[in-house]
Amino acid sequence: MELNSIQPADGAKHYKRRVGRGIGSGLGKTSGRGHKGQKSRSGGFHKVGFEGGQMPLQRRLPKRGFKSLATPYKAEVRLSDLEALPVTEIDILALKQAGVIGELARVVRVILSGSITKKVTVKGLIATKGAKAAIEAAGGSVA
């Protein structure tokens, strides 16, 4: 085999079907579009979601919920995240520097998820009851 003799396998390539080129082709005259009507015309199709004038589904259903603008300023941290940090004094700045929380976070909650074995001091963070108990059981403190 040589590079100049490589060919596609038999049947792998076919000619593009040309429409509107005579009765014998099977796609002549109306080019497979049938007779008359909106769908037979050029540009004759409705936009996505259009239901022929009937009230569309997305307008029939009620609006629900909203996007809280406070979300980027709140963050949750797991106990397993605290375990992985190289420092023992943990505050918002330490979490931001470690990349555990986003730069915009202002309020941080420590939640009981995962486990903690090392002694850490948590400052300036909110801790849930379970998380506080787990930190104190490991010999740490929540200030």
From Swiss-Prot:
PROSITE patterns: RIBOSOMAL_L15. One of its GO terms (molecular function) is structural constituent of ribosome. Residues 1-52 are annotated as: Disordered. InterPro entries: Ribosomal_uL15, Ribosomal_uL15/eL18, Ribosomal_uL15/eL18_sf, Ribosomal_uL15_bac-type, Ribosomal_uL15_CS. It holds the Pfam family Ribosomal_L27A. The keyword Coiled coil does not apply. Signal peptide: none annotated. Residues 21-31 have a biased composition (Gly residues). One of its GO terms (cellular component) is cytosolic large ribosomal subunit. Gene3D superfamilies: 3.100.10.10. GO terms for biological process: translation. Keywords: Ribonucleoprotein, Ribosomal protein, RNA-binding, rRNA-binding. Belongs to the universal ribosomal protein uL15 family. Binds to the 23S rRNA. Part of the 50S ribosomal subunit. This is Large ribosomal subunit protein uL15. It comes from Janthinobacterium sp. (strain Marseille).
